[in-house]
Amino acid sequence: MAMLLPQNPSQVHAAAVNGDKNTLHKLITESALRDSEDQFGRTPLMYCVLADRLDCAEVLLKAGAGINKTDHSQRTALHLAAQKGNVRFMKLLLSRHADWRLKDLEEMTPLHLASRHSSSKPLSLLLKHMAPGEVDTQDRNKQTALHWSAFYNHPEHVKLLIKHDSNIGIPDSEGKIPLHWAAHNKHPNATRTVRCILEAAPTESLLNWQDYEGRTPLHFAVADGNEAVVEVLTSYEGCSVTAYDNLFRTPLHWAALLGHAKIVHLLLERNKSGMIPSDSQGATPLHYGAQSNFADTVAVFLKHHSVRDEPDLEGRTAFMWAAGKGSNDVIKIMLDLKKDIDINMTDKYGGTALHAAALSGHVSTVRLLLEQGGMVDPLDVMKHTPLFRACEMGHRDVILTLIKGGARVDLVDIDGHSALHWAALGGNAEVCEVLMENGISPNLQDQAGRTPLQCAAYAGYINCMALLIQHDADPNIQDKEGRTALHWSCNNGYLDAVKLLLGCGAFPNHMEHTEERYTPLDYALLGEHQELTQFLLEHGALSIAAIQDIAASSIQALYKGYKVRRAFRERKKLLMRHEQLRKDAAKKREEERRREAEQQLSFAEAGQKQRVLLAAVGVEKLSLDEAEQRVKDSVAAKGHKHKKSSSAHNSQSRREKPSRAERRTREPETSDAPSIRSLPPVTPMSTKKCPVTREEVCVRETFGPDTGISLNCGSANERRSPAGSSRPGSAKPVHTGTHVAPGHMETTPTPKPRPSTTGAHSKNASQDTPQHNETQTTSKGNKPISEHKPTGSQPSNNTSVTRQKEKRQEKETHREKDKRSRTEGDKQTVREKQKGTGIERAKERLMGRTRKKLAEKEKEKKKDGTCSKNQAAVVIQRAWRRSCVRGRIRKVLCRSLKGVESAEATALLIQLLWEWPVLHDHTHRKPSDVQAPPTRIAGKKSSVLQNIYGAAPSKRGTSLRAAALKTQSQSQSQVLLDLSLRTHKQLSAVECVNLVDSVSQAKQFSYHLRPSSGASQSSQN
C-alpha cells in the first residue's frame, strides 16, 4: 500500500485548495490519498472547507473521504465550517451525518464555535439537529454556548439559545454566569444582551450573583465604566449597590478607584441604605478617590450629603491619603469644599498629613500643607517629625523645604536617634551633608550608644562613612555593648569599609562589653570572611583568645611578685606575733607570782584572826557523838516538817551524810573532851517589832542572855529589798524557832533558865529546833497582812492557824462572788424585763457569760502575776538579810570580842554558824507548802528565781565548800596548823570557814547592794 502512495502527497491538498476537480479525481483514485494528512493533521476535505470549495468537497465525499476525521487539534470539518459560519458546508456535512458532538482539545463542540460567529444561522442550523438538553454542553472552562454568546455580545444568539431552553444560571470555572459576561462588555449595545438575560429571569439572586471572587455583574459593569449597563442593572430593585467582593470592596469603591465620577453619582443616588461602606482596612470610597487624585470624583463624594471624611482603621482620613499620594488637586478641592478639615489631624500613631507627604517625598504637597498652616514639627508616638521621615527615605528637596519652613534638626526620637542617624542608616550622603551643615554633630549617640558612623558601617555605605569621617566623626566610639563601627563592618564583611576605618585611625582591638568579649577580628572569623581576616591580621588585629593569652602571662608575672611580697609579710607578722606571745607569757608569769603572794598574805591574816578568835572565845569542847546526834535531830525535825520538799534538798542532805560519816571515822576520840552538857543552853527567840540580827543572836548564845553587848538596830525596821522602797509592799515573813538563818527572819532573845543537865539541854534543843514558817498573803490592795506570832511550841499550831486563815479567806471570796453574782443577776433581770423578745434575752445571757469568763481569767492572771512578784521579792529580801547578818557577825567577832575563851567553844560556834544555813534553809517555806502539795506557781517561782539568781546557796553549799577545800587546801591547812594539837583533833570533822567567801557568795544574790554604814565600815577594815 505504501507502493501506491504518490511521491508528493501535498498535491492532493493543493488540488483541494485550488478547486482542481480533474487533478483531484486523478489523485483520489487511490484510497490512501483521500484522507491523507499534512503536517497539521488536516485532510483534503478540511482544506476544501477552509477554501470554500464545495464541489471538491462533494467529490471527496463521493469518493469515500472520512467526514469525522480530526486534525491534531481534534477538530473535524464541521468544527471548521461552524467556526467559519459556512452554512452550505454545514448543511452538506450534516446531511452526510457529521457528528456535532465531537469535541476538540478544548472540549468545544461546533455549537460553541457557531456562537462566536456574528450570524445566528449556523447556530440555528446546529440547534435543529440537537436533541433537547444537549444545548448546555460545556467546554473545558465549564462554559456553554450561552456564555460565549453573552461574551461576544450577540443578543440574537442569546435569545435563540434561551428559546431552546438554555440554562442562564450555569456557572463556569470562575463562577460566572452568562450575565457576568454580558455586563463585562464596554460596548454600549451590551445593554441588549443584559436585558435579554434579565427578561428571561429578573430575579434578585441573578442580579447579585457573585463569582468565586465575590464580584457581581455590577462590579464588572463599573470596572468597565459602562454607564448604560450600570444604569440598566441598578434600575432593578433587587440590585445591591453595596455588595462586597472578597476584598471587601463595593462597586462604589471600584468606581472611585477608577475615577468614574458619573457612575459614582449614579451609585450614590441608587444607594438606598444611606451609608457609605468601607473595606477590610476601614477605607471608604472617598479614600480610594483621594489617593488616585480624581478631583471630580472626590468632589462628587464631598457634595453628597451622606459622605463624610471618616478615618480608616489606622486613623487616617482621605485627606491624609491624598497627602501621602501627592494628590494636590484633591487636597485643594477638599480644603475648598470642607472648611472644617483639620490639617494637623493625627492618625492612630500620631502621624499627620505632613508626615505622609514627607515620607512619600512630594515636595509640592509639603509646601502646600505648610502654606495652609500645617505644623512643621509634629511628633508621632515614636517622636518622629516629618524631617525624620524625609531623612529616612533620603528626600533631599523635602528636607530643605522643611528646614526652610522652620523644622528643628536637633530633635531625637524615643530611641535617641537623630535625623542624622536615619539618614546614615539609609546611606544618603547628600542628606547627611545637609544635616551636618545645619549643626548636627556626627558623634551624637543614641540610647544604645551608637553613632551615625556605626549606622552607616552596619550597611557598608562607603560614601556616607567617608563624608562623616570628613566631618570629624570618631571611628573609635564604642556603644554600650562595646562595639565600634569596625565591629559592624567586619560582621557583614565590608572590606572597603574596614580599609576606610583603619586608614582613618580606627583601633582594631576594641573588645565588647559582653561575656564573649569579641574583637573585630572575631567577627570576621565568625563570618568566615577570609580576605577581611587576612587584612586585619596584617594591620595588627588580635582575637580575644590572643588577648587573653597575653593578659594571662602578664597576670602570672604580677601574681608571682604578689606571692613573694605576701610571704614576706606573713613571715614578718609571724615573727612579731612570736615576740608578742613571749612578752605576754612573761607578763602572765609575773602576775601569777604577785597573785600567789597576795593569797599567802591573806591566808596568813585569816589564820591570825582565827587564832585571836580561838583565844578569845572559851567554849567547852563538844564530843563527836553528841555533835552527830544534834545534827541528826535537826535533820529529823527538818524532814518531819518538810515531808513534801523538793528532791534537790533531799539529794543534798544525802550528800552531806556520808561526808559527816567520814569525818566521824577520821575524828580521833580524846578522853578529856568535854561533853555537850557543859555548854550554855540555847535560848528561844520571840518576834518583836525591833528585829535582832544574827550577830546579836550569836553573841547572846555565846555569852548568855545577860550579856551587856548590844548592836545597832536602827535600820532593823527598814525594808531591805534590792528593788528599793518604790516597789509595792509584799507580805512580811514571820519566823519561829530559836536558831536564826541569815536573812530569813528577825528575832529577839527571850531569857530562860539555864538547864543544869545535858539531857534537859538536848530536850530543849530538840523541841526548839528552828521551824521557819512563812505566811504570805495579799489582800485586794496588795497590803501585807498582820504578822502571825507563834507560841514557839510546835509546828502544828502554825499550820492550823494558816489553815484557818485560808478558810476564812476562801469564805470571804465566796461571799464576794455571791454578792457580785446577785448584783449582776439583778441587773440582768432588769435588762430582761426591758427587752421585748426572747432572742435579745438569749443574746444578753450569752454576752454576760462571756464577760464573766473574761473577767475571771483577767483576775486569775493578775493574781498569779502578783503572787509571783511577791514571792520573788521575799526570796530576794531573804538573801539580802542573810548577807547583812553574816557581815555584822564577822564585824562583831572581830571588834567587840576581846575575852579569852577555850578553843573548843570557838570551834563549836564556828561549826554552828557554818552549818546553820545548811540545816535550816529547807525549813523556810510557806505554811501552804507543808499542808498541801506544791502547786504550779511554786514550781514557776523556783524556776524563775533559778533563772535570775542561779542555784540557791543552800543547794550548792556542799559543792562550793568542796571546791574551796580542793583549791585552797594548802592555805586552810596553814591556818589550822596554828591551832593547838588538842583543838586540831577536836575540829578535824569541822569544815574550814572562810567568812570572806561567805560574804562574796551572798553578794551574788543581793545585786551587790549593801547599807551605806556597812559599806563604810568594811572599807575602814
UniProtKB/Swiss-Prot annotation:
State any GO BP term from the record.
kidney development
Where is this chain compositionally biased, Basic and acidic residues type?
A: 579-598, 653-669, 803-866
* Keyword presence, Repeat: yes
- Biased composition of type Polar residues is found at 759-781, 791-802
Q: Which UniProt keywords apply?
A: ANK repeat, Calmodulin-binding, Cytoplasm, Cytoskeleton, Developmental protein, Repeat, Wnt signaling pathway
Where's the motif D-box 2? 862-870
Query: Entry's InterPro entries?
Result: Ankyrin_rpt, Ankyrin_rpt-contain_sf, IQ_motif_EF-hand-BS
Residues spanned by motif D-box 1: 483-491
Q: Give the molecular function GO annotations.
A: calmodulin binding
Feature: compositional bias, Low complexity: 722-731
Q: How does it assemble?
A: Binds calmodulin via its IQ domains.
Q: What is known of its domains?
A: The D-box (destruction box) mediate the interaction with APC proteins, and may act as a recognition signal for degradation via the ubiquitin-proteasome pathway.
Role noted for this protein: Required for normal renal development and establishment of left-right axis. Probably acts as a molecular switch between different Wnt signaling pathways. Inhibits the canonical Wnt pathway by targeting cytoplasmic disheveled for degradation by the ubiquitin-proteasome. This suggests that it is required in renal development to oppose the repression of terminal differentiation of tubular epithelial cells by Wnt signaling.
The protein's name is Inversin
> What organism does this protein naturally occur in?
Danio rerio
